[in-house]
């Protein structure tokens, strides 16, 4: 797909995206847009961003041939983009470094964030400590219970973790509360959104900070295999790790791009978090327009996933647009498929993956078995699974 360019000047990716917020937030978002437009044209801003990614985060993250897993499963060769090896254990820190640099540039002394699995909360607390800012992290009460290790990490890093008891007590509700807080303290507070969603300019900004993943992968796969992968695949909740991998590949027409949503118990039940795969209509949530799980009255539906980080009823607007123009295919992995993949990566590769990332390997049979052993699938291993040990143990009936 040549000459891909999005968003437009109003923050739309096709018919998705935009700016749907209260009047009180418009000035803050316009201030942010102006600051980001200035920063992205400033070579020194990007030079400092790259320095921190190298010396603080530990980039580039390697690509790794999962040879034993590939042999066991059959079909295409599986390569992993090892975002789990970043400082803080996931891809989230790529974005929080960029937004913290922008917050400092704007003179903000306090950052707030929402988090589901806790990885974005940890990454936000980390950069707040790194740059000498105070931080408050909003987290659904149910997610706090299933992600206690990350809650403690955030507190160790100096963050104030605020539990959200409203609604479904998960990521959607944490984002609601964070946006309310931003309205109340917009003058001194910078809201670090963790996913490629939210009102403009956040989806573009998060994508630009995360596309280091795909840019590195293109160079690394060329060096390691002499060519680009046949398929590049990533899990999708809001979609920041996926857009980070996909964006540099969009114009590479020979590379199939596949996003994996959370199938939960099954998309034929109410218990999933797969707006595109389930055929959800377009709606507005958290300041942007996109495919959204909702009832006939436009009320946002509850979601379910074994993975807290994918437990979200919407999807980033660029993903919805890429689905519309048929550049990216979207599929699902169910809870049981993700848990099986979690075990396989542990046993065959000595890698404990995040449950979010496990969905990608868990969806692989649908694609991989149709491919030959000389073909390559690049999997974005978006995070490590330390945070999920308690959840997996509980599901296995093991008391830690």
Swiss-Prot record:
Cofactor(s) the protein requires to work: pyridoxal 5'-phosphate
Pathway it works in: Amino-acid biosynthesis; L-tryptophan biosynthesis; L-tryptophan from chorismate: step 5/5
Signal peptide stretch: none
EC numbers: 4.2.1.20
Keyword annotations of the record: Amino-acid biosynthesis, Aromatic amino acid biosynthesis, Lyase, Pyridoxal phosphate, Tryptophan biosynthesis
Any one of the GO CC terms: cytoplasm
Domain of life: Bacteria
Record's catalysed reaction(s): (1S,2R)-1-C-(indol-3-yl)glycerol 3-phosphate + L-serine = D-glyceraldehyde 3-phosphate + L-tryptophan + H2O
Top-level class of the enzyme under EC nomenclature: lyase
Residues the record lists as N6-(pyridoxal phosphate)lysine modifications: 92
PROSITE patterns referenced in this protein's UniProt entry, alphabetically: TRP_SYNTHASE_BETA
Pfam family, one: PALP
MF terms (GO), sorted A to Z: tryptophan synthase activity
Function recorded in the entry: The beta subunit is responsible for the synthesis of L-tryptophan from indole and L-serine.
Subunit structure: Tetramer of two alpha and two beta chains.
Family of the protein in this entry: Belongs to the TrpB family.
HAMAP family from the UniProt entry: Trp_synth_beta (MF_00133)
Protein name: Tryptophan synthase beta chain
Organism: Neisseria gonorrhoeae
Name of the gene this protein is made from: trpB
């Amino acid at each position: 797909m040549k000459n891909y360019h999005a968003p437009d000047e109003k923050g739309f990716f096709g018919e998705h995206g935009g700016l749907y917020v209260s009047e009180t937030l418009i000035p803050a978002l316009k201030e942010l847009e102006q600051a980001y437009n200035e920063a992205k044209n400033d070579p020194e801003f990007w030079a400092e961003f790259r320095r921190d990614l190298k010396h603080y985060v530990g980039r580039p993250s390697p690509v790794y041939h999962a040879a034993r897993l590939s042999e066991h499963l059959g079909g295409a060769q599986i390569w992993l983009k090892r975002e789990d090896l970043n400082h803080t254990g996931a891809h989230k820190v790529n974005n929080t470094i960029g937004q913290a640099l922008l917050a400092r540039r704007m003179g903000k002394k306090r950052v707030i964030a929402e988090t589901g699995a806790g990885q974005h909360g940890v990454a936000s607390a980390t950069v707040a400590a790194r740059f000498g800012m105070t931080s408050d992290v909003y987290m659904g009460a149910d997610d706090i219970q299933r992600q206690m290790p990350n809650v403690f990490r955030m507190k160790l890093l100096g963050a104030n973790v605020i539990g959200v008891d409203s609604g479904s007590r998960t990521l959607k509700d944490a984002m609601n509360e964070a946006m309310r807080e931003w309205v109340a303290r917009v003058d001194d507070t910078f809201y670090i959104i963790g996913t490629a969603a939210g009102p403009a300019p956040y989806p573009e900004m998060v994508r630009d900070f995360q596309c280091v993943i795909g840019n590195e992968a293109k160079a690394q796969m060329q060096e390691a295999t002499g060519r680009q992968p046949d398929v590049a695949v990533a899990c999708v909740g809001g979609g920041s790790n996926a857009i980070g991998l996909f964006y540099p590949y969009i114009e590479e027409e020979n590379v199939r791009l596949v996003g994996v949503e959370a199938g939960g118990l099954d998309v034929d039940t109410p218990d999933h978090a797969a707006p595109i795969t389930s055929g959800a209509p377009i709606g507005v949530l958290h300041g942007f327009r996109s495919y959204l799980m909702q009832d006939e009255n436009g009320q946002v539906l509850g979601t379910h996933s074994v993975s807290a980080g994918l437990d979200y009823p919407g999807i980033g607007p660029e993903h919805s647009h890429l689905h519309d123009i048929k550049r990216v295919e979207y599929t699902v992995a169910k809870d049981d498929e993700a848990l099986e993949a979690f075990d396989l990566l542990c046993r065959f590769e000595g890698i404990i993956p995040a449950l979010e990332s496990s969905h990608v390997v868990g969806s692989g049979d649908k694609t991989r078995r149709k491919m030959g052993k000389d073909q390559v699938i690049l999997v974005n291993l978006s995070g490590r699974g330390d945070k999920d040990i308690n959840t997996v143990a509980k599901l296995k009936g093991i008391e830690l």
